[in-house]
């Protein structure tokens, strides 16, 4: 993500703070869920990388009226290889749920383990591209704490639901050979 795209620090902290409060309310009402139907699926991307879904998060809400898919990627700053650092991050990442579930427009997230290049991805469904962009512009500040600055990227694909992307792999128009374009699911 270009630095010009991120929110200034104070508005980002305000947005993240409001999200945390909203998430707390949602957790108290038990409207946040961790279904297992996609856990273990291997997703392949147009850049040749693959990653396994290790967690899924959904919320109770009406179907998105303006669906879009958001893909976010980053590489952890101090963790390399396939060892305990990645396992620890995947375990601890559950705590990061409070940083996205309460944002307006959130529908669902697939959490993808690191690929062969050490890159993690989140594959989200969001209600409204503007809401997805607002979220990711605030998220930059949380990611920069643990990520290599130049590795933080995102792509919003409007007009499509996450499950449609999973079912109709490669249907993104125009076809793109990019890090975010899903080309296979197993």
Task: Write out the residue ranges for each language-model feature.
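Secondary-structure boundary/capping positions in well-ordered alpha/beta enzyme cores
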Residues: 106-107, 150
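Short, Lys/Arg-rich amphipathic alpha-helical interaction segments
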Residues: 119-125, 129-178, 186
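Short S/T/G/P-rich N-terminal loop/turn motif that feeds into the first structured element of a domain
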Residues: 1-105, 158-186
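Generic marker of residues within folded, mature protein domains
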Residues: 62, 99, 112-113, 144-146
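Short, well-ordered beta-strand segments in beta-rich or mixed alpha/beta enzyme
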Residues: 6, 69-75, 108-138
